[in-house]
Amino acid sequence: MMKFPALTHYWPLIRFLVPLAITNIAIDLGEQALNRGIAAVKEDAVEMLASYGLAYSLMKFFTGPMSDFKNVGLVFVNSKRDRTKAVLCMVVAGTVAIVFHTLIAYTNLGYYIINKLHHVDESVGSKTRKAFLYLAAFPLLDAMAWTHAGILLKHKHSLLVGCASISDVVAQIVFVGILLHSHLECVEPMLIPILSLYMGALVRFTIVGLGYYKVIHDNIPESSGPEVGGDATIKKMLSFWWPLALILATQRISRPIVNLFVSRDLKGSTAATEAVAVLTATYPVGHMPYGWLTELRAVYPAFDKNNPSNKLINSGTVVTKSHIKRFTFFCLALSITLCFMVFWAPHISESILVDIIGVDHAFAELCITPLRIFSFFPIPVTIRAHLTGWLMTLKKTFVLAPSSVLRIIVLISSLIVLPYMGVHGATLGVGSLLAGFLGESTMVAIAACYVYRKQKKKKDSDEDMTIDGEDSAPMNEVRSRGRMDDIVELREEDEEELDED
């Protein structure tokens, strides 16, 4: 068997990321399977696709912040007590989401948000509110699954997480096929994708839940020891989580905002419904070649030397920051190549839309230009994911909050300005999303530079203090550990670069 010594340090990264990348792609395939379940209903298929797309994108706004609790499990959960606190936070948040879904479905608030703001007709609005009610419990189920997935990732069980997500998609596809042959197609076709979505999430939650109890629960202590800073408090978890939640909320609310402006730009006409349907169909297809890059966020925390579950150092295989940077660049190059192969080569994207989602050729033609714009998304997504992972390791996520604000500002500005330049429909929506991504990644880069310079200043000042008092043993050694860790991080990074040169 051939061995490649130069790749030795990259195999752990590949083994960790590949299941997560497959997970991300599998989620997109699941969305396409759900869209096919709607498209297979020949009567009012476009209207149904638009209604489900509006409801699903609004629901994702609530699911997004809670699913990002995966990163809390990845960084903070070191004991059973930590896990209990994380689950409690998710139960409370899920209950709030259920209440809000119910209010949207049954009160004038829902009529204003869906019918009035989106300028959709009464039929589409009614179907959207009904779908939103059916999706009320999904955010809680999804968040519970992702919380346990984060704990599994902390212990390098990314393969188990990947298997759970693939099983989720398989369950969705199977149930779409089963329900299409049931009486639901005639009675309530909207339930076909929604019930399939629930069954897939239930399968995923069952697998990660059983996996947690099988491989982790008995191997972690009741409470965290002082070597990891003691038990994480709910306040610390929420302080770490809220900037990530805000970012993901703005990412998820971007789709409803795009749907809103695109629909209003076309005055709620038949063309508006068609444009929203095109966006619903192109989101999962366009996201598939680059969406997995988001999982690069988990690489830094998982391979952090301070992670108590990290056994790579003991096994002799050390993954340094330089290895992670090179691996990230390779992933970016691979994603860009995939995007241009799929979206710019003749007939490939149309075949995906026709054969997998089940739309007709005329509808697929409308999706070509929006899909080609997706080819440029990998660059800002990679920059954002790589730097966010580094900041998560330092537990300095608070500096990321402004990036979400800038993303929304750039997104809305583009949605307002581009129509005056002759850009309309789904092309307007995807082009504005790209502008928002670029604005967000720029702000994340600025935040990372700010933190890095601050760390450098700390390193320089503490080196001076160490020289002055190197013969003394400070009484507050434990208390100053967090600060010294940051300095060691920077010092080791410099040493790694010198060693490899």
Swiss-Prot record:
GO cellular component entries: plasma membrane
Topological domain ranges for the Extracellular compartment: 107-131, 180-189, 349-362, 427-429
Membrane-spanning residues: 86-106, 132-152, 159-179, 190-210, 328-348, 363-383, 404-426, 430-452
Protein name as annotated: Progressive ankylosis protein homolog B
Entry-linked InterPro entries: ANKH (IPR009887)
UniProt gene name: ankhb
Annotated keywords: Membrane, Phosphate transport, Transmembrane, Transmembrane helix, Transport
GO BP terms, alphabetized: phosphate ion transmembrane transport; regulation of bone mineralization
Record's keyword annotation contains Lyase: no
Skewed-composition ranges (Acidic residues): 462-471, 491-501
Function: Regulates intra- and extracellular levels of inorganic pyrophosphate (PPi), probably functioning as PPi transporter.
Family: Belongs to the ANKH family.
Annotated source species: Danio rerio (Zebrafish)
GO-annotated molecular function: inorganic diphosphate transmembrane transporter activity; phosphate transmembrane transporter activity
Comp. bias intervals (Basic and acidic residues): 478-490
Bilayer topology: Multi-pass membrane protein
Cellular compartments annotated: Membrane
